[in-house]
């Protein structure tokens, strides 16, 4: 009985020092060397993460340059579009100031046009738009009774659509510019740090075990953020998390600034294009619900409505016919330029979305390192410390020859990884395999939280 008890105590003691059944003792020196090698691998992965951040920084800067070029094109297109709109409004004003001609002819046609237009529009709405037909019908009746054939004759609906489109486009660009400028100032501050402009020093410095435990600065020692956050001596224990946290906070702030505008009402209903028969029904439905002007798009389906558009008043007033031609020409130019502007605006929005996506990647690259660094509260010199190595025999529950290694990443909870039989403890890749699996396990756990 006494022999059995002594044997059990001996096994416990050897377990504490790293020895396991079926294998020779793993000495403290071996555990330290394993920790040393594993820490080198973790250090390399941190360096890779930082290099990845720098690559994303380059992409963000490239995207921003493309955005600036696109914005310049937008401003040029906006000026041309507004000039065309001004010409259209001037032609419309001149046409309205002329004494009415052909009024009797147009009024007679208008009275026959209205019932057909209403019936055609309500059939379309009931079939395609479906919701709220009763309210839309009453709204349309009022709209048609208040409209004049002259408004119809000079394409007033197209002019109104242009002006509404211009208002929405201006608002959308203002919203994007406002939020991007906020994000941009944060990004600029982030990237001005010397960490992004110089190669960082090696993050891991191997010290004799007799010296005080410490870690060197991860970022360049004279970095603005390191300098402001860590005014203490470089020989004091390093607050690793404090170096990453400002970056994460700034990235999150930039993301919030970029995300706001994509959820604003302006982006839920972007400016409409000039839709002809057979085009986007959803936009027509929205216009009908908004102010009934969408129904005027269906004028080509009613004979009497088409006749109004073809009324020729040049015999009675040649100047009116001339002004109408000028109005039609300026209207076509304004519509074409507005379509072009809308395409540029969409491209600009895609650039904004791309920047937002790159910020998400930037956050992902920094986040796992920061979360890992957040665990670093002690003065242990190792990024990865090996606490137990167990090589299993055929008597254990684990397959024979497999090695179980328990490690800690900084001050994390212990992580157990298994190393296959073909990678023995003497294999140079042994600790690289252990560290790689430990980081994978850590990242997996982090994603699941």
Curated annotation (Swiss-Prot):
Q: Where is this site: Cleavage?
A: 227-228
Q: How does it sit in the membrane?
A: Peripheral membrane protein
**What would be one Gene Ontology cellular-component term for the protein?**
blood microparticle
What does the UniProt induction comment state? Up-regulated in response to enterovirus 71 (EV71) infection (at protein level). Up-regulated by agents that induce apoptosis, both at mRNA and protein level. Isoform 1 is up-regulated by androgen. Isoform 2 is down-regulated by androgen.
GO terms for MF: amyloid-beta binding; low-density lipoprotein particle receptor binding; misfolded protein binding; protein carrier chaperone; protein-containing complex binding; protein-folding chaperone binding; receptor ligand activity; signaling receptor binding
Biological processes annotated in GO? amyloid-beta clearance; cell morphogenesis; central nervous system myelin maintenance; chaperone-mediated protein complex assembly; chaperone-mediated protein folding; complement activation; complement activation, classical pathway; immune complex clearance
Q: Which UniProt keywords are present, listed alphabetically?
A: Apoptosis, Chaperone, Complement pathway, Cytoplasm, Cytoplasmic vesicle, Disulfide bond, Endoplasmic reticulum, Glycoprotein, Immunity, Innate immunity, Membrane, Microsome, Mitochondrion, Nucleus, Phosphoprotein, Secreted, Signal, Ubl conjugation
Q: What is the effect of changing residue 86 to Q?
A: Decreases molecular mass of beta chain
Free-text description of this protein's post-translational modifications in UniProt: Proteolytically cleaved on its way through the secretory system, probably within the Golgi lumen. Proteolytic cleavage is not necessary for its chaperone activity. All non-secreted forms are not proteolytically cleaved. Chaperone activity of uncleaved forms is dependent on a non-reducing environment.
Q: What is the effect of changing residue 145 to Q?
A: Decreases molecular mass of beta chain
Domain of life, source organism: Eukaryota
**Tissue-wise expression:** Detected in blood plasma, cerebrospinal fluid, milk, seminal plasma and colon mucosa. Detected in the germinal center of colon lymphoid nodules and in colon parasympathetic ganglia of the Auerbach plexus (at protein level). Ubiquitous. Detected in brain, testis, ovary, liver and pancreas, and at lower levels in kidney, heart, spleen and lung.
Q: Name the chain's protein.
A: Clusterin
Q: What is the lineage of its organism?
A: Eukaryota, Metazoa, Chordata, Craniata, Vertebrata
Gene label? CLU
């Amino acid at each position: 009985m006494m022999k059995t008890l002594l044997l059990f105590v001996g096994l416990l003691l050897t377990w504490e020092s790293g020895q396991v059944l079926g294998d020779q003792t793993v000495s403290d020196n071996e555990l330290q060397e394993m920790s040393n090698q594993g820490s080198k691998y973790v250090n390399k992965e941190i360096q890779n993460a930082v290099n990845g951040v720098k690559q994303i920084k380059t992409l963000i800067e490239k995207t921003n340059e493309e955005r600036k070029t696109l914005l310049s094109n937008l401003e040029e297109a906006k000026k041309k579009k507004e000039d065309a709109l001004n010409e259209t409004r001037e032609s419309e004003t001149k046409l309205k100031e002329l004494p009415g001609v052909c009024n009797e002819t147009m009024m007679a046609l208008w009275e026959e046009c209205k019932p057909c237009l209403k019936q055609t529009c309500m059939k379309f709405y009931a079939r395609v738009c479906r919701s709220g037909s009763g309210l839309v019908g009453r709204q349309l009746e009022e709209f048609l009774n208040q409209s004049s054939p002259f408004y119809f004759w000079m394409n007033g609906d197209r002019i109104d659509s242009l002006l509404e489109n211009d208002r929405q486009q201006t608002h959308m660009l203002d919203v994007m510019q406002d939020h991007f400028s906020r994000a941009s100032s944060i990004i600029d501050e982030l990237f001005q740090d010397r960490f992004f402009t110089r190669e960082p020093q090696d993050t891991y410095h191997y010290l004799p075990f007799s010296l005080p435990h410490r870690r060197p600065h991860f970022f360049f020692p004279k970095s603005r953020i390191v300098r402001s956050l860590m005014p203490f001596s470089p020989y004091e224990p390093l607050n690793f998390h404090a170096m990453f946290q400002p970056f994460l906070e700034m990235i999150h702030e930039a993301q919030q600034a970029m995300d706001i505008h994509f959820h604003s009402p302006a982006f839920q209903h972007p400016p409409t294009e000039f839709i002809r028969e057979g085009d986007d029904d959803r936009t027509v439905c929205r216009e009908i619900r908004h102010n009934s002007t969408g129904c005027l798009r269906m004028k080509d389906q009613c004979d009497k409505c088409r006749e109004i558009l073809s009324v020729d008043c040049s015999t009675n007033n040649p100047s009116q016919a001339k002004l109408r031609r000028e109005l039609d020409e300026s209207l076509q130019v304004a519509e074409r330029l507005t379509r072009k502007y809308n395409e540029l605006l969409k491209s600009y929005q895609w650039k904004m979305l791309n920047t937002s996506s790159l910020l998400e990647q930037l956050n992902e690259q920094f986040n796992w390192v920061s979360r890992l660094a957040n665990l670093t509260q002690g003065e242990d010199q190792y990024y990865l410390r090996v606490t137990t190595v167990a090589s299993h025999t055929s008597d254990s529950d684990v397959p024979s020859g497999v090695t179980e290694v328990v490690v800690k990443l900084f001050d994390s909870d212990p992580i157990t990884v298994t190393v296959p039989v073909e990678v023995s403890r003497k294999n140079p890749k042994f600790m690289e395999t252990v560290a790689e699996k430990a980081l994978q396990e850590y990242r997996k756990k982090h994603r699941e939280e």
